């Protein structure tokens, strides 16, 4: 499960409405939709300043931010392994912030995110928490598990105490 504000959410928003997705899905090339939309959004979205505050009160301010995502699993839409250390069983949220990079560097880093290799580069910040508030200097697209939540300048994410139990048939 993930939620994000900025570039990743803008991609989710656009993928939901583009006719390109249905066409590429019919060709079994649906993941290319994310690539095409990501390239377009990378060229048009303006980086912002964001403040990330965790439950401990620790506050970090980032400039020229493309996006911040909060995840409890490794992968986000299109197969991006944005938070390689994330686990659905560790009672922690993983945060990735992508900032202080040129558009060209973001473009070059995106393919490395499929394998989780992007974490080695400057401008990629990872953290963990149980609760976080993210504030942007202007309203940006927000998604929750790939579903658009419209434009927001503040989001608050926390873990619920109860866990979802799923019953599946035995083979």
Residue map of PLM features:
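Long C-terminal subdomains/extensions of small-metabolite kinases
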Residues: 1-171
